[in-house]
């Protein structure tokens, strides 16, 4: 049995035309576009299909638009396929989509709340002094150290999203962000400015966060039907009562996305489906782990693969075998740090023949390893890494 999680994208995934194929093919999509439009007194369908990209990117517009398309994708999936998830997770704004789909908030409540949130966030930086940038090819600790070194009360900057091992987002005052980028580039990092209208998940959102508390107090939050991973803690919400506090701090705290995906991995998730426009989270997941099969659902045509359970199962089997083969090879060829040759030999001599037999089975296309064989293979690799006394970071790289 495959364990399934649903992922929901955040701001930056918007594009003109998003959700149109769902609207063309499903009555429920037409209904939800109408409900969203009624809830916030604006034509959400027109904004998504015919709007100007600049207008769609404005925070107060992008947030309800993305949430609407994401919830439509979820409802289409449940209507057409209906396999329930074990976990839900949303990236930044996407956490609100997850809350709706798990029954914590109604769709209309979420659209209204997210519109208020977008207005507050946009108004928190009226002079547009802030910006956000994706930073790649650098690990989190050096980047955090740079932000701490450069950030001041008047020119703040900090890590806003921890997306993967070497892909993060910084947010804050434009001048401070530029300083961090210059120093990070000397360390070999690359950067890309994000197409957003405010410095989200930074201290520049503090006033918006405080005002948002008033809006949050107007809503009741029910317990979730399935566990939702919080961006703030990278573990599931305890209950509906904890949602309000998390959503207020959500504006100023970083999105712990890589940790959230590792949580899913550790709890046996084998497949994820990204519900919403584009496939940004599918791409991010591939940078975090090769143990989870990821699929987008942003348009009607994506349903074809999702409805083919045999092909999906084959994808998972092939993914596991490919990753296991890579893990075996890397554990065997990794440097031996153990200076006690006799102890090392005693530990590994019984292991290598077992690894070789399993490796031969993995490489045979017609063979499907049992769950016990998979677990045993990973355990053997772990024992070899420990016998070689590999540094923790290298063991994690091999075994992740």
Swiss-Prot record:
One of its GO terms (molecular function) is [acyl-carrier-protein] S-malonyltransferase activity. Keywords: Acyltransferase, Fatty acid biosynthesis, Fatty acid metabolism, Lipid biosynthesis, Lipid metabolism, Transferase. The active site is at 92, 201. The keyword Acyltransferase applies. It is an enzyme of class 2 (transferase). InterPro entries: Ac_transferase_dom_sf, Acyl_transferase_dom, Acyl_Trfase/lysoPLipase, Mal-CoA-ACP_Trans/PKS_FabD, Malonyl_CoA-ACP_transAc_FabD, Malonyl_transacylase_ACP-bd. Signal peptide: none annotated. This is Malonyl CoA-acyl carrier protein transacylase. Transmembrane segments: none annotated. It catalyses: holo-[ACP] + malonyl-CoA = malonyl-[ACP] + CoA. The keyword Ion transport does not apply. The lineage of its organism: Bacteria, Bacillati, Bacillota, Bacilli, Bacillales.
